């Protein structure tokens, strides 16, 4: 059996500051829910981006049903919602399913 590398971080209220706000790399956060169809469609796209950019980017996932405080803090009203953080600040936002190329372009703009 091979080693499984964690390419996507589970972000919670407890680790948000360290993993996102204090990150030395840009962070792409996916606000999602397990029951959300478009969220499930987006998941493999984000996984691929995380693997391809692991040295320059962090990808985190926030389950809005479990992390209601974070969902409220970032005014998540529709999911999936992607938020890019750079240097502890929101650099870009996107709501709804997006193809990989659009998300990659959003990340490039934030770098």
Question: Language-model features: where?
Answer:
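Conserved helix-turn-beta segment immediately C-terminal to the redox Cys motif
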Residues: 24-26, 41-62, 66
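Conserved Rossmann-like nucleotide-binding pocket used by diverse enzymes
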Residues: 7, 12, 32, 58-60
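Conserved redox-active cysteine motifs that mediate thiol-disulfide chemistry
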Residues: 31-45
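Short conserved loop adjoining the S-adenosyl-L-methionine
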Residues: 68-72
């Amino acid at each position: 059996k091979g080693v499984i590398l964690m390419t996507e971080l589970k972000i919670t209220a407890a680790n948000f500051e360290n993993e996102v706000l204090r990150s030395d790399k840009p962070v792409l956060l996916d606000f999602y829910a397990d029951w959300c169809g478009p969220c499930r469609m987006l998941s493999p796209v984000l996984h691929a981006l995380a693997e391809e950019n692991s040295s320059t980017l962090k990808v985190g996932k926030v389950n809005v049903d479990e992390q209601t405080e974070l969902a409220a803090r970032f005014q998540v009203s529709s999911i999936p919602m992607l938020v890019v953080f750079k240097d502890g600040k929101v650099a870009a936002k996107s709501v709804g399913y997006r193809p990989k190329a659009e998300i990659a372009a959003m990340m490039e703009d934030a770098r």
